Regions:
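Alpha-helical transmembrane cores and adjacent cytosolic helix/loop segments
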Residues: 1-216, 320-326
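Peripheral (non-transmembrane) domains and long loops of multi-pass membrane proteins
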Residues: 1-12, 197-329
Length: 329
């Protein structure tokens, strides 16, 4: 197992452990205060615990090596568990709306408000610190699970702070309706967080092109392009939880032999392999150039040239994604 993957799994274990502890603290605060706003926070923490378990499962499964039944590995499971986490978040938010509505219709006095405020402030500080670190490591490793955990924990922090403000206002004004109103407000924020996690997960499941990754490929190839690479087109990028599969067509001079073409392909893939720190595999189709592309070709000493070199064409996101050789329009 790679050190990086061990770090990711170890961090997810801490997410689970901390989520359980924070849940116990918040449930205690709810029992002591009877605040539906604090119940809102506790319910979201239950989702954190369930998400932590699923995250650990998916990380361990996604780390399994490829096999004949899963030739691209098991990384897609991270998208599935993240989608389930998003659904759970939205269900919790809807339950909060229901409970808060009941409290609006039948207000109840809040007890031990100071105790509840202190507990929420402490848990929010722990949540934000852990969420920030999860987001940082998740972005570095392209782990969907960690990025989802980080986003969830940080949003939990913001909602907790908002709930603290609401509880403080209840204490100052004795307006019990504020407790339920704050709960409803932050349940809507939680709903939005759940939707964003589901949206990101569905993008991964449906192999939606990550344009930021495509832009990285464009920049690297433009900076290090070889004269032998006439063009690159029909680029397809699939993200398997931080491990990329790249399909593309590489156009080379039509007259070079198979061994020479293979050498160009090796140089091409090595360039991207280094950029993605080895977390990538390729399927490269070799095309031969056509006479219309002579105007783009930098190989001046070419006995097969039919048209003078005109100008070097920049490789862009659009012409790399298009399934067409460059210069034929």
């Amino acid at each position: 197992m790679k050190l990086e993957q061990s770090k990711i799994i170890g961090l997810q274990k801490w997410v689970f452990i901390v989520s359980v502890l924070l849940l116990l603290f918040k449930l205690t605060a709810w029992v002591y205060t009877g605040s539906v706003a604090i119940l809102t926070d506790a319910l979201e923490s239950i989702v954190n615990v369930v998400a932590g378990i699923m995250g650990l499962y998916s990380l361990n499964l996604s780390n399994k090596p490829k096999d004949t039944e899963h030739p691209y590995g098991h990384g897609k499971v991270e998208f599935i568990t993240s989608a389930i986490e998003g659904v759970l978040i939205m269900v919790a938010a809807l339950f909060i709306v229901f409970e808060a509505t009941q409290h609006l219709l039948h207000p109840q006095a809040i007890r031990s408000i100071d105790f509840g405020i202190v507990v929420l402030l402490l848990t929010s500080a722990v949540n934000y610190a852990l969420g920030w670190y999860c987001s940082k490591v998740g972005k570095q490793s392209q782990s969907v699970v960690l990025m989802g955990s980080g986003a969830h924990l940080k949003s939990d922090t913001y909602s907790t702070l908002g709930i603290v403000i609401g509880v403080v206002l209840v204490k100052l004004t004795n307006a019990l309706w504020l407790d339920a109103s704050v709960a409803i407000l932050f349940s809507l924020i939680i709903l939005r967080t759940g939707y964003k996690i589901i949206r990101q997960s569905v993008s991964g499941i449906m192999d939606e092109t990550d344009m930021l990754v495509v832009d990285q490929i464009v920049n690297v190839l433009n900076e290090h392009r070889s004269k032998q690479w006439i063009d690159v087109h029909n680029v397809r990028v699939i993200n398997y939880a931080g491990f990329y599969h790249i399909d593309c067509h590489l156009t080379v001079p039509y007259y070079i032999n198979v061994n020479e073409a293979h050498q160009q392909m090796d140089a091409f893939t090595a360039l991207l392999h280094n950029h993605f720190n080895g977390q990538v595999e390729f399927f490269v189709h070799i095309d031969g150039c056509v006479p219309q592309q002579c105007k783009l070709c930098q190989i001046q000493a070419c006995s097969h040239r039919q048209t003078d070199f005109n100008a070097l064409q920049d490789w862009t996101r659009q012409n790399l994604l298009d399934n067409a050789k460059h210069g034929l329009q």
